[in-house]
Swiss-Prot record:
Signal peptide start-end: none
Organism: Mumps virus genotype A (strain Jeryl-Lynn) (MuV)
Superkingdom: Viruses
Lineage, top ranks: Viruses, Riboviria, Orthornavirae, Negarnaviricota, Haploviricotina
UniProt family annotation: Belongs to the Orthorubulavirus I protein family.
The protein's name: I
Ranges of biased composition (kind: Basic and acidic residues): 151-162
Spans annotated as Disordered: 54-98, 145-171
Amino acid sequence: MDQFIKQDETGDLIETGMNVANHFLSTPIQGTNSLSKASILPGVAPVLIGNPEQKNIQHPTASHQGSKTKGRGSGVRSIIVSPSEAGNGGTQIPEPLFAQTGQGGIVTTVYQDPTIQPTGSYRSVELAKIGKERMINRFVEKPRTSTPVTEFKRGGGRERLLKARQSKRRA
């Protein structure tokens, strides 16, 4: 059974995602301080701790315990921010999806949440709008025509082949 997302639901989902992205883009990054326990909002920690994926990672099953694996910390990589980069919170990161040729048009951006002030590249906001439109149009059903559409079937034209064989046998 196919489940379709209605157009207004898709718009709401994308709008929520855009608000989350704008929230994180609007706050300056201050080195490794943003990754501390203090950055977790009160009341969110029980949800994170109760996450079933986290429980699965912390308590592997018996079938996985016997396998040879590297040390627990081997897959963890720390991010080191140089002091010159850490002091410049809110610096603009170049957009890798667009060619940096210096040729750009005028982009008008409409923000629905007045508390979120845009920072960063307006090109990325425009790219997100294009992606939103594509996602909305992707799941919209196309109108069906009144005339039936003939579908290609494997081995099609078999009736003509059988009639030709029967006419050869009669001759």
